[in-house]
């Protein structure tokens, strides 16, 4: 059974984005200089993931210090930082591919007055399963209508507007009819896909400290407790520990014999520190290691271990085989050479091809991605250029096709090139900005069904499936932007 996965992110009004669409493949790499908005796209998916946990919107985005887990700290910039300058609304959406079909979520969050859901809709293959109506701003309620295929028709009821409506459906819909069961199945698939999102932005300054030993240590988003996680892996799974060691050895600029641990006791608390064993050169602890090696260690650990050792609030009621982890790798190439960053991306591609996880990575220079993704086919990877429109200042996304190395002689290559242009209706090297309508074109039209064309078109992940990105819900959302 296919696992629910996010295949498209719609950034209608969020930070530096206006009416932008990001197609998501098993491995998606965004590149561009600092300040163009790569991190903003990762933040958008992180925001949807937080809202899917069912907590109040303001607390979900500003952080809940009394909590542990992904909501303990704020999303970058907090709630106020997510609202575009001069606006009073966040408008986001996504499309999830599930065993039941393409599920489309669109949400408008207003921040003028009480933070609230102003509009939210959920559709499955174009059929509306849930939609919102009139608001009672003073009492923070919104009328919700959901699908029901009995004689009494669709059901309406007021819901609290301070929380994502879709996250409330499993607690409010009885499931007493086939229609309601479909609503529950679609909402649970969407929530499962969003809750399995893990933002990873390693901070080397925090990773150098001694970590409290914990046999159940879960890596935090800043990787501050990486030493405790390495200790857990060394005791729990020698196979993964060995894979992690080989991944680190592959990029080390000097012979590396092992990945060890130093231990000490402070005030009755056992603490550990990851150590790079360099043989005759000595042992370098995490407190002395370079920023790049520490960041590489954190990224490799996440790619090789999966959700079981991450600080996630996963849908434990859903069997592991029906869940799919998505890693948001922030600034993946920082402190690494092109070859080292390419090695990480090759590892990410390998794990994505095995359906172990999905990765959305951001880096500045595309050289490492082009090297790692050379020969990628079948829609397994998408390279997306991020830039700022010089007139509006908004971020523009330009998906690109990973280039496949030419096989055979020049004559064969020329013939293949001519054939590709004829079949695709244009040069396969061309790129265009992704329009708000949800379909992108790279050397030709992109199929909405999510299958790669023979000409190598970028996958749109079924963007136009559930009513199209320019549907009524999207238009109403823009009208509510204010």
Model-derived features: positions:
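Electropositive, glycine-dotted interaction segments
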Residues: 104-242, 246
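Conserved P-loop NTP-binding catalytic core
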Residues: 43-114
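Phosphate-binding P-loop
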Residues: 19-25, 319-321
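N-terminal pre-Walker A segment at the start of P-loop NTPase domains
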Residues: 1-16
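Hydrophobic positions in the central parallel beta-sheet of the AAA+
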Residues: 9, 325-328
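C-terminal lobe/lid and adjacent interdomain/linker elements of RecA-like ASCE P-loop ATPase modules
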Residues: 342-438, 460-462, 467-482
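Conserved ABC ATPase signature
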Residues: 242, 249-253, 257-321, 331-339
């Amino acid at each position: 059974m296919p696992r629910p996965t996010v295949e498209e992110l719609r950034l209608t009004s969020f930070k530096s984005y206006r009416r932008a669409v990001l197609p998501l493949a098993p491995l998606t790499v965004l590149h561009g200089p600092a300040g163009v908005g790569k991190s903003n796209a990762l933040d958008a998916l992180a925001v949807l993931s937080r809202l899917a946990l069912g907590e109040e919107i303001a607390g979900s985005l500003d952080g809940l210090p009394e909590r542990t887990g992904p909501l303990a700290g704020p999303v970058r910039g907090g709630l106020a930082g997510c609202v575009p300058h001069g606006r009073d609304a966040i408008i986001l959406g996504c499309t999830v591919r599930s065993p039941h079909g393409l599920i489309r979520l669109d949400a408008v969050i207003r921040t003028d007055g009480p933070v609230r859901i102003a509009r939210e809709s959920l559709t499955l293959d174009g059929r509306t399963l849930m939609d919102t109506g009139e608001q009672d701003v003073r009492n923070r309620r919104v009328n919700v209508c959901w699908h029901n295929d009995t004689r009494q028709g669709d059901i309406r009821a007021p819901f609290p507007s301070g929380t994502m409506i879709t996250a409330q459906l499993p607690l409010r819909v009885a499931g007493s009819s086939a229609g309601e069961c479909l609503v529950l199945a679609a909402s649970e698939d969407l929530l499962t896909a969003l809750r399995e999102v893990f933002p990873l932005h390693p901070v080397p300054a925090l990773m150098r400290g001694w970590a409290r030993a914990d046999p159940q240590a879960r890596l935090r988003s800043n990787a501050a407790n990486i030493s405790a996680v390495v200790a857990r892996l060394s005791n729990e799974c020698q196979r993964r520990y060995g894979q992690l060691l080989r991944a680190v050895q592959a990029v080390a600029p000097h012979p590396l014999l092992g990945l060890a641990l130093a231990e000490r006791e402070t005030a009755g608390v056992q603490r550990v520190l990851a150590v790079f064993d360099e043989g005759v050169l000595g042992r370098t602890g995490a407190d002395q290691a370079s920023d790049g090696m520490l960041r590489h260690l954190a990224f490799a650990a996440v790619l090789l271990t999966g959700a079981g050792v991450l600080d996630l609030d996963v849908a434990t009621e859903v069997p592991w085989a029906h869940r799919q982890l998505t890693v948001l790798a922030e600034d993946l190439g920082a402190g690494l050479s092109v070859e080292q960053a390419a090695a990480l991306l090759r590892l990410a591609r390998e794990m994505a091809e095995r359906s172990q996880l999905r990765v959305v990575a951001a880096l500045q220079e595309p050289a490492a991605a082009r090297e790692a993704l050379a020969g990628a086919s079948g829609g397994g990877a998408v390279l997306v250029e991020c830039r700022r429109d010089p007139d509006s200042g908004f971020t523009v996304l330009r998906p690109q096709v990973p280039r496949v190395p030419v096989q055979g002689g020049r004559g064969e290559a020329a013939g293949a090139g001519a054939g590709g242009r004829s079949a695709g209706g244009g040069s396969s090297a061309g790129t265009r900005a992704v329009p708000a309508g949800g379909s992108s074109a790279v050397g030709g039209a992109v199929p909405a069904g999510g299958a790669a064309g023979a000409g190598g078109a970028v996958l749109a992940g079924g963007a136009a499936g559930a009513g199209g990105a320019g549907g009524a819900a999207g238009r109403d959302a823009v009208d509510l932007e204010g």
